[in-house]
């Protein structure tokens, strides 16, 4: 089981004027409940809170959902995105290339989230986006782990090809690339399990 989480009330925050230990504890419990609702931690009464294993069932279901939603997004984007919006996506890809060379997985992950989030928002699908994000934490964990054990260039290539297809208004190709992109999880999961077995219990 992943490590138990402990609250350190001697942290620098507790030394800030006007922030009491009681306030810190209350904030911690709120955060703990939110993490538990996202199934990122497991609360065991009288024992403590433990980081949860990766829930592959949630990951698979979210992948299936995103596969459908983002293929439709790609189709709609072909008839909606402006040159300025396309340029913004291309700029994201250019930053990806820079951070791949630097090996900065945190920046790469942030840019990946921004790329997909931008497509939802550019197409006016904020409800879809909020739904996906509400289920995202376990999927995000596997994404980060995949960056640590798999070459990220294929993901970047998918992004570039997707934007090019949208720019060319090729709806069929855009949908195909989007679905292929979401299938990367299935390609990566065996490698993720092999390199990080302690994150799984199924």
Q: Where in this protein do the model-derived segments appear?
A:
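Short linear motifs at protein or domain termini
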Residues: 1-79, 190-202
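Active-site loop of classical SDR/Rossmann-like NAD(P)-dependent oxidoreductases
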Residues: 151-153
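C-terminal effector-binding regulatory domain of bacterial HTH transcription factors
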Residues: 172-202
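Charge-rich, acidic-biased intrinsically disordered regions
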Residues: 138, 143, 168-169, 197-202
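Conserved amphipathic alpha-helical segments that form helical-bundle/coiled-coil interaction surfaces
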Residues: 62, 79-144, 155-164, 173-184
